[in-house]
């Protein structure tokens, strides 16, 4: 394989940058661009050691000073020789060091190529490689715990145990079908049925956790809706922890959609603070209302905000009916709880089981909003030591495996021939092997690693 290199840290001004080189000649390439002060040569350095020194160009002129770390094959991330050069984190100097590595024979790595080599060299399974990417992108504790479990091989072992069991069963079924005259032990249909039921239960758990996992991993598209001047922007600022939306006593201040992400417990709310939804003759405001309605149609969660100190009017009820027809998950927020409550709760409880009182101005009611949101979305109560949130590719394989294994169980219960059962189990086992990456096509592997950043 060719020698590859890339910047493994974000390309931005910072304390340090790391340039990674991997391949058979990685250490000799490192030796040409780095001159250690503490030893004679990089090529004499043992694995898992580092040295301070000078980064130099082909003429021996100093470019920067830094630290070089050596990892020797096969005890490295990729399974190949690796050199990592840590230099100062300026954009120009980082690019300069990368160019020096390319001048000495390394090629610029593709997206995810280091982790892909780890997979191809048997250092990681495909699911573990996906766990690496999920660790990088995790935005909360549940997502990070799941990513770590996947990265350490928990999902691979769970699915691999299933597939191995069915491969053994397939071998027994094939022998029994192909050599009926031989004195072979009879296949226990009860044991086979039990194996299928156990596998289906395991797959059902993975599939059932998927929707919640996607919410925790990717966040929730959330629209804050309501009439003008009910406190939508104040609520958004409260959730963000800083002033993002302009807040005034003038109705209709927000005319465009303001979008930001906020953390609410373990959830990431992708917030859209919309223009107040009401009838207006103002052309600009009217356009803002239309945009707000489009946002509502695409939202997963709608937080409808009402002023607790003002009785509900026709426009309020029209908004409630409009969102109800969209079939969205709704939390109704009665804002300004520090003022006198004149709203009849019963009018609102027809539209949502989650009606809460808050004072966004005083930052009161955040916990109640969090509890309502988690309950409405079915989030919470996960065991951090065992819950794995599979990704879309893995779920597609799990659902396909489940379909075939369920058909095998149904065939068994209906008294069909073991030939028919064998075909279904074989298809199910193949789907499980694709999930773990043991039988994934080159196109699937390429697709997985194309989602990585360059340098990982």
Tell what function each PLM region has.
Residues 240, 275-276, 300, 307, ...:
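Short glycine-/small-residue-rich Rossmann-like dinucleotide-binding loops
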Residues 51-64, 68-72, 252-280, 298:
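Switch I (G2) and immediately adjacent beta-strands of P-loop GTPase domains
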Residues 271, 305, 333:
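Generic enzyme active-site microenvironment
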Residues 285-309:
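Inter-motif core of Ras-like GTPase G domains
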Residues 1-145, 149, 153, 326, ...:
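A glycine-rich (often HGG/GG-containing) alpha/beta subdomain
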Residues 269, 301, 331:
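Short, Asp-centered acidic motifs that coordinate Mg2+ and/or phosphate
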Residues 2-7, 11, 141-263, 280-282, ...:
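C-terminal-of-GTPase-core extension/linker across diverse P-loop GTPases
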């Amino acid at each position: 394989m060719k020698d590859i290199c890339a910047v493994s840290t974000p390309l931005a001004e910072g304390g340090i940058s790391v340039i990674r080189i991997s391949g058979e000649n990685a250490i000799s390439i490192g030796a040409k661009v780095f001159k250690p002060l503490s030893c004679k040569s990089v090529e004499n350095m043992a694995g898992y050691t580092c040295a301070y020194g000078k980064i130099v160009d082909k003429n021996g002129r100093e470019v920067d000073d830094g630290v070089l770390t050596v990892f020797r094959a096969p005890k490295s991330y990729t399974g190949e020789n690796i050199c990592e050069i840590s230099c100062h984190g300026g954009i120009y100097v980082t690019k300069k060091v990368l160019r020096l590595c390319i001048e000495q024979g390394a090629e610029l790595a593709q997206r995810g190529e280091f982790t892909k080599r780890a997979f191809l060299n048997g250092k990681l399974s495909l699911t573990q490689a996906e766990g690496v990417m999920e660790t990088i992108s995790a935005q909360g504790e549940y997502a990070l715990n799941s990513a770590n479990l996947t990265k350490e091989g928990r999902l691979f072992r769970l699915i691999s145990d299933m597939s191995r069991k069915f491969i053994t069963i397939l071998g027994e079924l094939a022998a029994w079908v192909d050599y009926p005259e031989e004195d072979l032990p009879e296949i226990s249909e009860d044991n086979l049925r039990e194996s299928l039921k156990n596998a289906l239960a395991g797959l059902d758990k993975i599939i059932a956790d998927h929707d919640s996992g996607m919410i925790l991993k990717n966040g929730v598209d959330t629209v804050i809706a309501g009439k003008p001047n009910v406190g939508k922007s104040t609520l958004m600022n409260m959730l963000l922890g800083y002033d993002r939306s302009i807040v005034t006593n003038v109705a209709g201040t927000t005319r465009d959609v303001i979008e930001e992400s906020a953390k609410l417990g373990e959830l990431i709310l992708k917030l859209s603070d919309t223009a107040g939804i009401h009838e207006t003759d103002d052309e600009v405001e009217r356009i803002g209302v239309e945009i707000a309605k489009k946002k509502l149609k695409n939202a997963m969660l709608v937080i409808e905000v009402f002023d607790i100190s003002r009785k509900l009017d026709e426009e309020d009820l029209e908004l409630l009916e409009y969102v109800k027809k969209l079939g969205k998950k709704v939390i109704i927020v009665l804002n300004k709880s520090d003022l006198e409550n004149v709203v009849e709760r019963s009018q609102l409880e027809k539209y949502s089981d989650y009606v809460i009182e808050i004072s966004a101005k005083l930052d009161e009611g955040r916990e109640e909003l969090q509890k309502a949101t988690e309950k409405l979305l079915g989030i919470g109560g996960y065991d951090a030591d065992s819950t794995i949130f599979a990704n879309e590719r893995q779920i597609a394989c799990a659902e396909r495996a489940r379909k075939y294994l369920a058909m095998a169980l149904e065939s068994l219960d209906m008294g069909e021939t073991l030939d028919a059962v064998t075909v279904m189990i074989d298809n199910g086992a193949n789907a499980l092997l694709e999930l773990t990456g043991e039988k994934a096509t080159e196109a699937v592997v390429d697709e997985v690693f194309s989602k990585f950043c360059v340098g990982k």
